[in-house]
Amino acid sequence: MAKVHRLMNAVLRLAAAAAAATAAVVMVTSRETTSFFGIQMEAKYSYTPSFIFFVVAYAVAAAYSLLVLAVPAGSALSRLALTTDVVLGMVLAGAVASAGAISDIAKNGNSHAGWLPVCGQIHAYCNHVMAALIAGFVALAVHFVVVMYSLHIVTDVICPCH
C-alpha cells in the first residue's frame, strides 16, 4: 500500500508542478505591442505587479512540487511538507485572485474610477493572460487535491483508524 501512496503522491505532485509551470510560462510570454491613435502601446506581464506575483508564486509552486518528491513518506518532513502545502495553496489562491482582478479591470474597466477597458486594443495579450489564469486555476485545483491526499496520508500514519 505504501508504494501505491508514493506513486499517487508523485503523480499528483508532478501534475501540480506541470500545471503551475505552465501557468507561469504562459504569463511570462504574454506580450503585445499595438498602435492606438498613432500612439505605440506595449503590454507585458512585467508592467503589472499582480502578474509578477502570479509568475513568482507559480514558479515557486512548480519548483516546490518537484523538490518535495524527495521527502520520505511518514517522516517528520512529510508533516512539514503538508503545512507548507497548505501555505503554498493560500499563496497560489492569492496570486490567481489578484491577477484575475487586474485582468477583469483590463477587460471591463472601472467606470467608478474612470478606468477604461484596454482589452479592446490588445486582444492577444488579454487572451494570453486569460490562458495563464485558466492554467493557474487548474494548478490551484490540482494543488488542493495534493493537500487533501497528503492530509489523508499523514493522518492515516498518525492514526490508522480503519
Curated annotation (Swiss-Prot):
Pfam families: CASP_dom
Induction cue: By brassinolide (BL) and auxin (IAA), synergistically.
Matching InterPro entries: CASP/CASPL, CASP_dom, CASPL
Main location: membrane
Highest taxon listed in the record's lineage: Eukaryota
Membrane topology: Multi-pass membrane protein
One GO BP: response to auxin
Subcellular location, record wording: Cell membrane
Tissue distribution: Mainly expressed in roots and leaf sheaths. Detected in shoot apical meristem, organ primordia, including branch root primordia, and vascular tissues.
GO cellular component terms attached to this protein's record: plasma membrane
Record keywords, A-Z: Cell membrane, Developmental protein, Membrane, Transmembrane, Transmembrane helix
Extracellular topological domain residue ranges: 29-50, 107-128
Transmembrane segments: 8-28, 51-71, 86-106, 129-149
Cytoplasmic side: 1-7, 72-85, 150-162
Protein purpose: Involved in cell elongation in rice through dual regulation by brassinolide and auxin.
Assembly: Homodimer and heterodimers.
Family: Belongs to the Casparian strip membrane proteins (CASP) family.
Protein name: CASP-like protein BLE3
Organism: Oryza sativa subsp. japonica (Rice)
